[in-house]
Amino acid sequence: MIKAPILQSLLASRDDLTHNPEVNNFGGKEQECLYLLKRCHNIDEFKQVHARFIKLSLFYSSSFSASSVLAKCAHSGWENSMNYAASIFRGIDDPCTFDFNTMIRGYVNVMSFEEALCFYNEMMQRGNEPDNFTYPCLLKACTRLKSIREGKQIHGQVFKLGLEADVFVQNSLINMYGRCGEMELSSAVFEKLESKTAASWSSMVSARAGMGMWSECLLLFRGMCSETNLKAEESGMVSALLACANTGALNLGMSIHGFLLRNISELNIIVQTSLVDMYVKCGCLDKALHIFQKMEKRNNLTYSAMISGLALHGEGESALRMFSKMIKEGLEPDHVVYVSVLNACSHSGLVKEGRRVFAEMLKEGKVEPTAEHYGCLVDLLGRAGLLEEALETIQSIPIEKNDVIWRTFLSQCRVRQNIELGQIAAQELLKLSSHNPGDYLLISNLYSQGQMWDDVARTRTEIAIKGLKQTPGFSIVELKGKTHRFVSQDRSHPKCKEIYKMLHQMEWQLKFEGYSPDLTQILLNVDEEEKKERLKGHSQKVAIAFGLLYTPPGSIIKIARNLRMCSDCHTYTKKISMIYEREIVVRDRNRFHLFKGGTCSCKDYW
């Protein structure tokens, strides 16, 4: 007779068990308990069912029952379920490979990757032989920990056990090596595959996306689509959309969207969020909003993508309204959402509103402010020209002041040409022994503004000694599905001669509009004429010349940049949009700029 109220409710609809005389034999008892196990919806129900397994001597006499109980708990996702699962595991006299796999998978699911590796070590010490279900989860743990050493050791064990031909293991190896930066090893595993499946290609694409290798990611994706009849898996599609978002490859992103609509009846929230992110970063805010509004369910990542997108387009007030909508829907803002909202305030000059959001975050107490949040606050004040207040904020921060905070402050000091405060930030940044080449370049540029040429030379010498390499600034234009990449003073393009002829024509036209180059943007100790020549060849100007030549008359010229544009390029582009009567959209590292009729959507606040 079952007396516990929870168990009675679980069995309420199962008359075939409660009234069946055979339920008293061993098989019947086990069937009853396994049925109860499936119906558990929380840890309290589960504990009562677990107790019943023990009371009926099923847990210790049936390995199948013990493994089922363990798997239900470990894979449930309930709060603290893995702690309870660990106690269940210790109660099993002779755990089998399935039980170890259950624990490894459970720990990986809750992101306790070190625990997963510990269980694998215990498994090997006890003599349990891993199987093809063991390694995908284990390699995922190595991937998330960036533990290439352990990953290579596990690869060796995979080889010894003859599991290297298993498709799931192969794809996990490709992903692990790729995301740990070992691209050659990732490619080597891929090339050895006898049959390259959609999953293998998707693993290659995802690995490149995980390392921010956007161009390589898209090359692989295009290769898969053109050289095979395979259709990428969801993970590959999401990675390709991420790459499109980061390179401004709108046409390819739209093609992927079309493919998804034709082949998948209902897009899940991950894919829909990826589409929102792709469209906002490719300059199509209306399309992103359309997808967002049609979504039946939205999560924090969806709102974060939309709020960040509105911020990119200078729609700070709309971003704040979106934030309010999220709260009304009952979602609790997390770390990522607050960063997005604070960035939106920063890029729209909403100082009062940004302070209010930050104060509310502190008051709520559900999100502990990190260096990233404080960095947003410093950026908000710095962009508004409140550098003294920004420094006071930094000095009052209750957490360790890391490179993010000082880099943000230094960047705003350089923009505002405040050498005195900038030197304070530079000194603090150098104390942190930064190995970020961008930091040294920022410091060097600050010294250049102050004509402190000895300090410039010393900083650049340090860059050389440390072997640091700065990624050069570039601008990208997409034309007929192909991306054209330009760097400063670029003469590598096949149409170089025509492009520079166009640049010369543009320069001639600008003289009649009163354009005067801002020589302060060339931070080198060279004469005035040399500075003018260097300004002419900035990558954005070369990209605009290409766009004017080869895009249809009257169409919008779209440019994606990897760095913030300089003030001279900003002024230059405003005037070109008026002279040639063309809309020019530029996405730099911080936001979108829509140049039209001699003005910019950022209202000169960027």
UniProtKB/Swiss-Prot annotation:
Species classification: Eukaryota, Viridiplantae, Streptophyta, Embryophyta, Tracheophyta
Gene3D superfamilies, per the entry: Tetratricopeptide repeat domain
PPR repeat segments: 96-130, 131-165, 166-200, 201-227, 233-263, 268-298, 299-333, 334-368, 370-404
Signal peptide (UniProt feature, chain positions): none
Region described as Type E motif: spans on this chain: 405-480
Keywords noted in UniProt: Repeat
Family that this chain belongs to: Belongs to the PPR family. PCMP-H subfamily.
Organism: Arabidopsis thaliana (Mouse-ear cress)
Origin superkingdom: Eukaryota
NCBIfam families assigned to the protein according to its UniProt record, in alphabetical order: PPR
A single MF term (Gene Ontology): mRNA binding
GO BP field: RNA modification
Any Pfam family matching the protein: DYW_deaminase
Residue ranges of the region described as Type E(+) motif: 481-511
This protein's name: Pentatricopeptide repeat-containing protein At1g31920
Region ranges (Type DYW motif): 512-606
Record has Zinc as a keyword: no
Keyword Glycoprotein on entry: no
InterPro entries, alphabetized: DYW_dom, E_motif, Eplus_motif, Pentatricopeptide_rpt, PPR_At4g14850-like_plant, TPR-like_helical_dom_sf
Gene: PCMP-H11
